[in-house]
């Protein structure tokens, strides 16, 4: 989706081949966009010229800002979407985009000539020639669904799997392994007793993902609901573990599942002392009565699913419309990719999304956008585009998977980012719009609007640093009245704003010329509160930038580097990274290895 839009909007004739045109941009698991770190990726996609944020704003039915009681670095939006409307609007955008052509087609082979992509071939034998191919296979590569001991091949429930592609790429040297993920059952709304659950309404504050849209307050017609499992639920699960493809006597699933989205079986087995687990009951859209049971992913048999669901308060008479299931699929080793998401093995082949071992719509969309941008830049003969870890969560994610690899489905987390205070929800457009404009995906008027915003923020901060106030009785009485300590010596408004308990709004009584722009005020408040921490982080990024500037020649022979450990030699020969900063993040690489490499590179030059 994002990949195809990027290449087409950058002027290249693009064919989007998909096995089901009615499920373009479909949400096969939770009907939601965003969440911790994920919501920030959606904002970053928007700042770079992608579409996800805009369509989320158009189709969201319940939205909340998460972690509002915590620091600014972990705040993020999460929205329930109308999944049918989301898919339809995305499909319509694709249909209306110049240079972009949709085709209902199932690709089964990729042809390579002299180490470069030549074409793809579908199941009808039709060959599509191309100088750049972006593969976004999701869970479709040799996908297999498990519901108890019942198994069948599928890309997701209701869709055929992709057969032949894995084998096609393996013969060129691309390595594949298996992962597993799962999704909970869907329940008919009229069979749910919501009076036994805790209601969670949409935000009372106006919110939106895209900078192009105006924040809105949604109607309260589509709340989410909170309920809990109990000992009866857990006893049914324990009693039936022998029927689980994960825990049965015959383990049918070999692929590793996601750590941060475990099945209910995993929770019960791994946390036996916990007597309840929360379940969020989420609406799937405006035109359906189906609800998603967030937190109740399982691969147990249908009969067991129904029995355990009916032990949960509010779900005693639940009617399952679609069973929960686990799905196992192939993914490619992401260490065989450059940071541009182009394959190191096959020139012109780009991989994005779950095929790279990641999980989640947002992670996939972010990768798709980067892959699409780089495919277009490659065809233009221009420098490739990458984001580093201090610029975006997208950069953190890509750097993680291509340097460290994955041994479980990768999910973006705020804890993965060393510079998360720089990578906030509120400043995504200030961070990245210039890049989006330079690439050609952000319009000039929008970029100029961002420049104006930056100028206003800078001017106002400078003004606040110059406006001095004295410790008069009147001023100290006011400060005491708003529960902050009085002044002992003259200070600036900016210094007062640095206090954690003071807002810009409260300073109006002391300020001769306050401003009214909420956008500017938000940035000023955050700058004041976190100025010292931000300055420290910016200093740390300089150290990282110095390591990044030490590039590694493609022809380097790691076997010739004195004092480089055997472990480092083996890993670096396999991954073939481009600079010392990337090398420093590889698990098992020691400071001594880094020093040996830097010393050798100096003599090499």
Swiss-Prot record:
Pfam families: GIDA, GIDA_C_1st, SAM_GIDA_C. Its cofactor is FAD. It is found in: Cytoplasm. One of its GO terms (biological process) is tRNA methylation. NAD(+) binds at residues 257-271. GO terms for molecular function: flavin adenine dinucleotide binding. Keywords: Cytoplasm, FAD, Flavoprotein, NAD, tRNA processing. NCBIfam families: mnmG_gidA (TIGR00136). HAMAP family: MnmG_GidA (MF_00129). Belongs to the MnmG family. NAD-binding protein involved in the addition of a carboxymethylaminomethyl (cmnm) group at the wobble position (U34) of certain tRNAs, forming tRNA-cmnm(5)s(2)U34. This is tRNA uridine 5-carboxymethylaminomethyl modification enzyme MnmG. It comes from Pseudothermotoga lettingae (strain ATCC BAA-301 / DSM 14385 / NBRC 107922 / TMO).
């Amino acid at each position: 989706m994002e990949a195809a839009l990027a290449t087409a909007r950058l002027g290249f004739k693009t064919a989007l081949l998909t096995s089901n045109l009615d499920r373009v941009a479909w949400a096969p698991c939770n009907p939601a966009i965003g969440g911790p770190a994920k919501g920030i990726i959606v904002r970053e996609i928007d700042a770079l010229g992608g579409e996800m944020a805009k369509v989320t704003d158009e189709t969201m039915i319940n939205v909340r800002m998460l972690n509002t009681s915590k620091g600014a670095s972990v705040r993020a939006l999460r929205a329930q979407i109308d999944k049918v409307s989301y898919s339809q609007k995305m499909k319509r955008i694709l249909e209306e985009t110049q240079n972009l052509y949709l085709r209902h087609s199932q690709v089964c082979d990729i042809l390579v000539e002299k180490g470069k992509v030549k074409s793809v071939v579908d199941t009808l034998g039709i060959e599509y020639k191309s100088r750049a191919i972006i593969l976004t296979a999701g869970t479709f590569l040799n996908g297999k669904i498990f519901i108890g001991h019942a198994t069948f091949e599928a890309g997701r429930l209701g869709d055929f799997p992709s057969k032949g592609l894995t084998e096609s790429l393996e013969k060129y040297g691309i390595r594949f392994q298996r992962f597993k993920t799962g999704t909970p059952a869907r329940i008919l709304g009229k069979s749910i007793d919501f009076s036994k659950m805790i209601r969670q309404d949409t935000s009372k504050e106006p919110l939106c993902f895209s900078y192009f849209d105006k924040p809105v307050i949604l109607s309260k017609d589509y709340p989410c609901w909170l309920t809990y499992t109990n000992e009866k639920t857990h006893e049914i699960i324990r009693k039936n573990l022998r029927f689980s493809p994960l825990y049965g006597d015959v383990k049918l699933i070999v692929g590793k599942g996601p750590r941060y989205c475990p099945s209910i079986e995993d929770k019960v087995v791994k946390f036996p002392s916990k007597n309840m687990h929360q379940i969020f009951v989420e609406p799937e859209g405006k035109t359906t009565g189906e609800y998603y049971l967030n937190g109740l992913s399982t691969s147990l048999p249908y009969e067991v699913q129904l029995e355990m669901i009916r032990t949960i308060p509010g779900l005693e008479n639940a009617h399952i419309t679609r069973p929960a299931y686990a799905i196992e699929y192939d993914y490619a080793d992401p260490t065989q990719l450059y940071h541009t998401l182009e394959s190191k093995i096959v020139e012109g082949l780009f991989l994005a999304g779950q095929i790279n071992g990641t999980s989640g719509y947002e992670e996939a969309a972010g990768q798709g956008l980067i892959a699409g941008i780089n495919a277009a830049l490659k065809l233009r003969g221009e420098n490739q585009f990458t984001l580093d870890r201090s610029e975006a969560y997208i950069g953190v994610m890509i750097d993680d998977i291509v340097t460290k690899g994955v041994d479980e489905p990768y999910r973006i987390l705020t804890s993965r980012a060393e510079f998360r205070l720089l990578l906030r929800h509120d400043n995504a457009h200030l961070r990245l719009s210039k890049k989006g404009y330079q690439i050609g995906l952000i319009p000039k008027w929008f970029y100029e609007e961002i420049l104006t915003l930056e100028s206003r923020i800078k001017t106002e901060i400078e003004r606040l640093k110059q406006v001095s106030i004295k410790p008069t009785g009147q001023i100290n009485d006011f400060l005491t009245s708003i529960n902050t300590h009085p002044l002992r010596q003259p200070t600036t408004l900016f210094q007062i704003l640095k206090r954690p308990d003071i807002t810009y709004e409260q300073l109006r009584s002391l300020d001769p010329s306050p401003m009214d722009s909420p956008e500017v005020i938000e940035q000023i408040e955050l700058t004041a509160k976190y100025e010292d921490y931000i300055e420290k982080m910016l200093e740390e990024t300089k150290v990282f930038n110095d390591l990044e500037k030490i590039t590694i020649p493609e022809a380097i022979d790691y076997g010739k580097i004195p004092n480089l450990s055997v472990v480092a030699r083996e890993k670096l020969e396999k991954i073939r990274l481009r600079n010392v900063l990337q090398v420093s993040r590889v698990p098992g690489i020691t400071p001594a290895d880094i020093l040996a490499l830097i010393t050798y590179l100096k003599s090499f030059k």
